[in-house]
């Protein structure tokens, strides 16, 4: 009888814990509201988001899916922006702190871009500074670029993240953060660890751009404001708890 009671009690604890975690997803605490945080994804609808190539949210079959409080780009055989395509916030942002949870599948590639202006005729994917989302162990992009600057949490093709010990395994939720200060100081964070920082618009930043694939774009990453973008790179990647506050 005691063992049955223990099992039942444990099951009840797990159920309560799971319900509590689910209730906290895509919500703001009173403290966060007071601090000026706003949800960019409400967990139920595509409100506040649109296609990077159209004024409406993409309706492609097997594209962006909203289910159980999670926004997922579904797999389309690794083709970059060839199915649903990238999505961007309707609003534009300058100085801000952006938080987001992401979950990779094996070999997946995606990205969270910022200061996206949508003015460049860039082909598949819209142009902007990118917090790289990647399965470094499997996806070949991790070995391209320079000194690992295309790996997870890096400033894509520009600066490598120092994330040793901060990464949770593929299939688990990780938390990313991008902080852009009014003085153009930028930081990338992963699971509570600062993994890189740089000064946007600085001579050092512009030297990094000159050595990258972004050098073809005039004043790359230097817009005063831009959209936040979630990338469709043809692999299944999920997002939730996307929130922002402006400085």
Where are these regions (language model features)?
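Bacterial N-terminal signal peptides that target proteins for export
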Residues: 1-9
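Bacterial N-terminal signal peptides
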Residues: 8-17
């Amino acid at each position: 009888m005691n063992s049955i009671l223990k099992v039942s009690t444990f099951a009840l604890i797990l159920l309560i814990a799971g319900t509590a975690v689910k209730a906290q997803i895509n919500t703001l605490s009173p403290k966060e509201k007071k601090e000026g945080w706003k949800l960019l994804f409400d967990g139920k609808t595509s409100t506040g988001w649109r296609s990077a190539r159209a004024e409406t949210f993409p309706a492609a079959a097997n594209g962006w899916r909203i289910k159980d409080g999670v926004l997922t780009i579904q797999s389309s055989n690794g083709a970059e922006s060839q199915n649903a395509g990238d999505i961007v916030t309707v609003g534009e942002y300058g100085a801000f702190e952006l938080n987001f949870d992401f979950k990779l599948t094996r070999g997946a590639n995606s990205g969270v871009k910022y200061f996206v202006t949508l003015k460049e005729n860039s082909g598949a994917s819209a142009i902007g500074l990118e917090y790289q989302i990647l399965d470094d162990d499997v996806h070949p992009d991790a070995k391209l670029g320079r000194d690992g600057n295309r790996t997870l949490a890096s400033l894509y093709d520009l600066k490598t993240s120092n994330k040793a010990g901060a990464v949770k395994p593929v299939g688990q939720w990780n938390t990313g953060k991008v902080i852009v200060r009014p003085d153009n100081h930028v930081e990338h964070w992963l699971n509570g660890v600062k993994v890189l920082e740089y000064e946007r618009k600085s001579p050092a930043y512009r030297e990094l751009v000159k050595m990258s694939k972004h050098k073809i774009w005039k004043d790359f990453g230097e817009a005063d404001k831009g959209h936040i973008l979630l990338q469709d790179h043809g692999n299944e990647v999920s997002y939730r708890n996307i929130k922002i506050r402006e400085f």
